[in-house]
Each structure stands twice: as structure tokens, then as C-alpha cells.
Amino acid sequence: GTGSLIGQSIIKSIKNSEFSSDYNLIGFDYFKDTVGSFWCDKNYILPDFFKKNATENEWLKELTSKIIDEKIDILFVGVDFELIVLAENKINIEKETSCKVVVSDPQVINIGNDKYLTYEFLKNNNLSHPKTFLPNECDFDNLKWPVIVKPRIGARSRGVFKVQNKKDLLEKINMIYNPIIQEYIGNEFNEYTCGIIFLDGELKNKISLKRSLKEGNTFLSEHFRETNKKINDYIDSIAKLLKPYGSCNLQLRVDDKGIPKLFEINPRHSGTTYIRSLFGYNEVIFILKNILEK
């Protein structure tokens, strides 16, 4: 939505580019007067299907109606909870409206949303990964401390704890709904956010930023001309096996042996989307031109 950090990043990537005048921006959100709404030519309020007075079908009907009325050519997703709904209804929306919906397949969304499925995807494809356990398969007495405990479903570091011992771990497990226990990788100074663009069955472009976090979001990013080859090769392998559609964000750390290990997949644009455009990597414009100019 136009009020989300991701939505605003998408809008700013267009508005602050040399192609700004080429596009009319139609925004959607669940609240009036969001920051991003003032950067759009129009902004519509959608029914909130998390509330009792609205349903998912009503939401889809309203969205589809506005896409047709405004002759929208391409739809970007700026809110996490919309991803799976749009992924499951992408074919019908595109058939009914001729609007391209930039969202990955449901399988990709599920792998990204579920941290244990992320781990299984990496493990099953022989890619480096943090050791990851469900509580019922974890040997608490033989863990290497510290470890990370976090929700199986979640994003932006919500409910994520670094724990130093068994007592603390058991306490945190009881605080978290559907938790997983994960190996602690490297340190906070070796964390990267990596963006990829995957279209037409191939990896089109990528970027890696070293990042520092505040409240689960990136507040400081560093871009280096020479990116670690191991990270580059690792990203390439993940992208070609995962096969997302459009933009996908990969969070990883490099361990003490220099091995990159991914711990989170966000099959969507990132909060750093606009920051990346300042480094010459404007993924939104790239996708717009690749899809609309065919």
C-alpha cells in the first residue's frame, strides 16, 4: 500500500527517476492520507479483508474493478499479506484486466513466508544454510550457543531473539507462536541484503548491500563495487532454483569461514528498493520497461 515502507520505496523509485513523467501512478491502501498517496495521481481505499465487515472476494472485486476503470497496466505489491492472495489470483486478474501482476507463484511465496520451508529449500538443493530445528526435533543439550529463536512465519525481525543458554531458549520458545531454532551465523557486521530481478525464467540483475538494522528495517546500507564472489555465486544459485517473478530480496550472513548462509527470503520488493535506485539499481523502472515495452 501507499502507506507502507515498501510501497513508498516503489513510488519514490519511479517519481525520482528520469522516467517519472512517463507513468501515471494509481495507489491503493487501507487508510486515507498516507504519505505515499500524496505522491500518486490517484489513491483508492480498499476493503480490509482482515476485518469482519470485508471478505477476500470483496477485496479482489474492488481491486479488479479499479484496475479496469483506471486502465492500469502493471500492479506492484507493497504489503506482505497481499502477496499470497495476489499470487493465487494472478492468472484470473490478468485474464480479466490485461494488467500484469508482479508477484511470484504461490510456491515461492510460501517458501519465503515460512522460515522452515526456506531452510528445507536450501537443504534439499545442497545450498549452504543455517542449521534449523523445530522444537520437537531439537537436542537442547547439544546446541552451540548462542542460537536464534524466532517465529516460523514472520518478517522484519519481529519476535526474533538471540539466546545464550538452554533456560533462556525454553523461556523464549514459550513466548513465540510456532517457533524455530536456528544456528547463529557470523555477526551483525557481516549481514547482507541482496536484491534480484528474475524475469522470463532468468536472472536479469542483482545487487548486494551490507546493512545495519534498526527495529527490523535497514537504516544504513553500504554498496561495494566489488561484491564477494562467493555471495554472487550463492545468489545466482538460489535465484535459478527458486525462480521468483520480478523482484526478490534475500537476507544472508557470512559465517566465520566466509561461507554465505541465507536465513530469509522476501519474494517482493524491499524497504531498500529506493536506496538501491540511488546506487544505479532501479529495479522498479527495470521491471516496468521489461514488462511494458515488450
Predicted regions and their residues:
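ATP-binding N-terminal substructure of ATP-dependent carboxylate-amine bond-forming enzymes
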Residues: G1-V101
